[in-house]
Amino acid sequence: MKISCEIIGKVDSGDVSKISMENNNGVVISTLTTGATLQEFLVPMETGALKNIVLGFSDFEDYYKNNLCACQSIGRVAGRIGKASYTHNMVLYSLPKNEGDNCLHGGPKGMQVQNWNYVTNLNDDYVETKFIRRLYSSVDGFPGDVTVSISYRLNNNNRLTILFEAFDVTESTVFNPTNHVYFNLSDKQDLSSHELQIYSDYRLELDSELIPTGQKINVDETNYDFRKTTDLLPRIEANNGFDDAFVVGGGTCDHVKEVAILHDKESGDGIEIFSNRNGLVIFTMDDIEDNIYFARDKGKMAKRREAIAMEAQTLPDAVNHKGFGDIILDKGHSVNYEIGFQYFNSSR
């Protein structure tokens, strides 16, 4: 295994670096300090060439020219917080609004717009890039200052693990991060050869602003039933796209479990998704701006429904709904979350 680092630009807070990790099987994970971003998940093809199975940009500045949050670290709280507020211990907390009256993905100064410090680690078991940053209430508008670390670990079993830790918090706050990863496992600009399985019996009911109502709906005999491996594109078309949250892991947040499998039937490439939380949000890029060019598309403009975002997290708006999971982080406490992406190829 090996690791390399290079400075690729500058922002007001300092240098922007790209860190690339490679295992003994030729799988390469590249990350950026801006947004603690997963830029590349490169897997070897039979030809020997590498294929990027996630959406990313060649220029780090392009991540901030659209609202996709492509493969960036999202927080303090992923997803929407209804009315940009919550109550804890009889105290009403107001958060920054950046989508109507709601707070989306940590607000306008969330983790994805920060430039992170990092350290690297190479040992017999894995290669690791660990990002760390102090988040200040005066900057992001969330209560309390807190230190956050985000570790990307790649092992020789072709598993990428993302570890989130929050600690040294000055007052009670909320923490529910994710990586807004977008997958396309093929070499095409669509999902026509993809199939999906989600271990979920229920999805969340959403209102017109995509805020959970508090109700969980059984997926049985609906377009949301992915309990068996299902061709993805026909479901996307029948449902007019997805921007939905599924209840996974038995609705608990106690240990790491497999929650979904995405597979490309043509190449055989697949990803098993693991999480120690109770929610999986899928988003199929149904509305996309013009003039977006992902590196993997080699000069072609991005297309609607080109990829699927699969965001493992505690259920959205959990702080406002009993039974959705506890995302409160009190002073003197710390919390750890884990997301795993196990790459495989079914034809080799």
Swiss-Prot record:
InterPro entries: Ald1_epimerase_CS (IPR018052), Ald_epimerase_bac (IPR013458), Aldose_1-epimerase (IPR015443), Aldose_1/G6P_1-epimerase (IPR008183), Gal_mutarotase_sf_dom (IPR011013), Galactose_mutarotase-like (IPR047215), GH-type_carb-bd (IPR014718). Mutarotase converts alpha-aldose to the beta-anomer. It is active on D-glucose, L-arabinose, D-xylose, D-galactose, maltose and lactose. Its EC number is 5.1.3.3. It comes from Streptococcus thermophilus. It holds the Pfam family Aldose_epim. Disulfide bonds: none annotated. Belongs to the aldose epimerase family. This is Aldose 1-epimerase. The active site is at H180 (proton donor), E311 (proton acceptor). GO terms for molecular function: aldose 1-epimerase activity; carbohydrate binding. GO terms for biological process: galactose catabolic process via UDP-galactose, Leloir pathway; glucose metabolic process. Pathway: Carbohydrate metabolism; hexose metabolism. PANTHER family: ALDOSE-1-EPIMERASE, GALACTOSE MUTAROTASE. GO terms for cellular component: cytoplasm. It catalyses: alpha-D-glucose = beta-D-glucose. Substrate binds at R80, D243. Keywords: Carbohydrate metabolism, Isomerase.
